[in-house]
Amino acid sequence: MPTMNQLVRKGRESKRRTKRTRALNKCPQKQGVCLRVSTRSPKKPNSALRKIAKVRLTNRNEIIAYIPGEGHNLQEHSVVMVRGGRVQDLPGVKYHCIRGVKDLQGIPGRRRGRSKYGTKKPKDYI
């Protein structure tokens, strides 16, 4: 336990918080190239085959990004835009691919939550 005099001279050093999206280098999004597209099963109470992509970003970092929505057209060497945001039931997946940007197409025929899945407004929409 330090004395009051020691605290006045030195002070307490605050803990450093680690950033959750370190690979993005403080950018909101980063572009990258898919190295591998595969599926992964989630943690204990859930059951599915979640679609993921291993991506090499423009700053040469390699990350694992989640591909949201039903169906996708990604394959090796596809160019994608990546944003931060983890997937709660996939350990180590801390990034999302952005739908409707670069080579990753939006979901056709989607009517609700379109902005999250890169879908244009349909003509007959009221």
From Swiss-Prot:
It holds the Pfam family Ribosom_S12_S23. GO terms for biological process: translation. Residues 12-23, 109-120 have a biased composition (Basic residues). The keyword Ribosomal protein applies. InterPro entries: NA-bd_OB-fold (IPR012340), Ribosomal_uS12 (IPR006032), Ribosomal_uS12_bac (IPR005679). Its main location: mitochondrion. Gene3D superfamilies: Nucleic acid-binding proteins (2.40.50.140). It comes from the Eukaryota. Keywords: Mitochondrion, Ribonucleoprotein, Ribosomal protein. It is found in: Mitochondrion. One of its GO terms (cellular component) is mitochondrion. GO terms for molecular function: structural constituent of ribosome. The keyword Chaperone does not apply. Coiled coil: none annotated. Residues 1-27, 106-126 are annotated as: Disordered. Protein S12 is involved in the translation initiation step. Belongs to the universal ribosomal protein uS12 family. HAMAP family: Ribosomal_uS12_B. This is Small ribosomal subunit protein uS12m. It comes from Marchantia polymorpha.
